[in-house]
Amino acid sequence: MDQDRSDNTALRRGLRIALRGRRDPLPVAGRRSRTSGGIDDLHTRKVLDLTIRLAEVMLSSGSGTADVVATAQDVAQAYQLTDCVVDITVTTIIVSALATTDTPPVTIMRSVRTRSTDYSRLAELDRLVQRITSGGVAVDQAHEAMDELTERPHPYPRWLATAGAAGFALGVAMLLGGTWLTCVLAAVTSGVIDRLGRLLNRIGTPLFFQRVFGAGIATLVAVAAYLIAGQDPTALVATGIVVLLSGMTLVGSMQDAVTGYMLTALARLGDALFLTAGIVVGILISLRGVTNAGIQIELHVDATTTLATPGMPLPILVAVSGAALSGVCLTIASYAPLRSVATAGLSAGLAELVLIGLGAAGFGRVVATWTAAIGVGFLATLISIRRQAPALVTATAGIMPMLPGLAVFRAVFAFAVNDTPDGGLTQLLEAAATALALGSGVVLGEFLASPLRYGAGRIGDLFRIEGPPGLRRAVGRVVRLQPAKSQQPTGTGGQRWRSVALEPTTADDVDAGYRGDWPATCTSATEVR
């Protein structure tokens, strides 16, 4: 009997050892303790207000939701508010400090209504967050820095941003195989559309009608070039579509989807589809008006290629140069720091080179685009580690030349002119697949590069600078906030609060995210206690 009992005990012990595994971590929202018992209600509200201001800046620029959430949580935890909950649904941001045994809950909610892109402010915000998470900025000082950051004017004059938009169109026209006259007309047309868009935005015109007017102008210029100089209008119209698509959230919606924020992803996708419909309406109105005026034109849609599989060195050089030019000019049009211009052009040029190589090897357009996007995400993360520019700047510039503008135009042409719904549906599916490949590829590239942030041997030391790693990503190793040693940042008035710094750890008890950008007009601000 004793022998059987001993055997059963040994068997149970062996089963426990064999089946033992890491328990799933409790969610952050389930924790009811704070880092220090000295945190009062005023400090909590200051920290929550700071985190929601940072989130507003990022979300208004079209940054990924996971990135916004992770950055806001990093900042809150840096000020010992470890029970902060951040939730984003479409354009609504909610930050909350949960109730504890001795403190009431505090919730702040705001809604972001307008969007604006200024990558120089993104770079400043990135550096501010790195200083905060390193334990060197008091909460009052952080608020003062945010005030200065959001009130600072654009670093470039508006005419230079318009020139950047024109250069972006010039590079895209080179990618689409346009002649020199087509490239010049594309640049001029894009500059006109940019100035018109600024005027319409100043008087409060909805984005849908801005897209209608922009697409209409691009189509009419293409028709005029066809009548006067005999130029094929296809490349001009397709270039205009890519330029108009560059400011939309199609790729961002795919990034939200692959990182688990499905509701926000669907909302962004609906917004992108609605604005794409505005582009379609503008093209159709212009084509119908030209037809009613008795002007007959022929659009050779299939004659325009994306130079995915050129067979000669010169077309390859033109394609890579066009991609690099578009990446450089897009950063200028988006008010990016000058130090990020070269890296953005390098990213776009290398992505196009990968696209060409895989196309020549017989890979499909979607697979080639996905692989190139992985490279863009990887390179963007390495650049952000060196703190030369935020990852969003390099990633955006790298993938914009690969937007499915030509597929959208072919779909519109098939539906409206050729009356072939099957062909139009095929092109729409190709455009959607390309957008998904871009979004998922960038996220995967960031995942592959994320171990370099936290010391991957000599390679990690090559790309990683000294000090705390700063912002964490939605992928890779997770970091845990630990008190910074011998750091006592000073604030303006009141009690001084000891900040904390980020230190890598193998724990998996915090959410993950990846990075963001600049401010907007916010409404519906409420605080609930």
UniProtKB/Swiss-Prot annotation:
Catalytic activities: L-threonine(in) + H(+)(out) = L-threonine(out) + H(+)(in)
InterPro entries: ThrE-like_N, ThrE/Ser_Exporter, ThrE_2
Locations listed in the record: Cell membrane
Residue stretches spanning the membrane: 88-108, 168-188, 212-232, 234-254, 265-285, 312-332, 344-364, 365-385, 389-409, 428-448
Keyword Transcription recorded: no
Chief place of localization: membrane
Record GO biological process: amino acid transport
Sorted UniProt keywords: Amino-acid transport, Cell membrane, Membrane, Transmembrane, Transmembrane helix, Transport
Family: Belongs to the ThrE exporter (TC 2.A.79) family.
Role noted for this protein: Catalyzes the export of L-threonine and L-serine from the cell to the extracellular environment. Export is dependent on the proton motive force. Required for in vitro growth and survival of bacteria inside macrophages. Increased expression is associated with low-level amikacin (AMK) resistance.
Protein name: Probable threonine/serine exporter
The species this protein was found in: Mycobacterium tuberculosis (strain ATCC 25618 / H37Rv)
